[in-house]
Amino acid sequence: YTLIDDSGYKNLESPITIKCSHGHLIKTTMKRFRRETFECPKCNNDIVVNPKVVPPKAAGATRVVAFDQATEHFGLSVFDNNKLVYYSLYTFKGTLDSRLVAITRMVRDIVIKEWRPDYICFEDIQYEKNIRTFKILAELIGIITELCKEAEIRYEIVMPNVWRRYANTAGKDRRTEKMLSVAKVKELYNIDVSDDVAEAILIGRYAVRRIGATTSLAFGY
């Protein structure tokens, strides 16, 4: 961001005008601008609703892909620089083995080969009382991790409480957290999505900020 006008500045509540990297002029206050979650509202409003395809990756763009992964419902989001350009829910059916094979092919042949991400971020496993579910999710993380390593793509496995703290969607239980995620995405982008997609979008937002906050991507691969 570039500061354009702070002539009336007296304190954190004073009005200022800044310009984002896309040239949008934003009137805000220093207090709002200093928040970790501050983003250009005009960029966020320029969102394609229910996009059917992932747009071609622009020259010089940093593409981030984020997952809220499970073997049946797989939320996914794509950001070019800090702009949300695609989001979708992939559904997999059949036996566990067939679902894992389908997910492997989707991540390898579509996400990695066609979309050409620079960075992939996905959620770490939450504690599960059901040991079978825990093992399945661990296997899924292992598959995605190996695909990232094989393609030499930088990645991050983020703990749920970390990205939720950034998104301000932590709740007393999982149901509340899902509702908060859907509401947060509606607030930010004015789109209606499922909780799986909402969480994939918020994980992507976290990853975009994570990349912007570090000069060297030393974590992950």
What are the residue ranges of the model-derived segments?
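Phosphate- and other anionic-substrate recognition elements at nucleic-acid/protein interfaces
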Residues: 52-221
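Functional cation/ligand-contacting sites centered on basic and imidazole/sulfhydryl donors
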Residues: 1-55
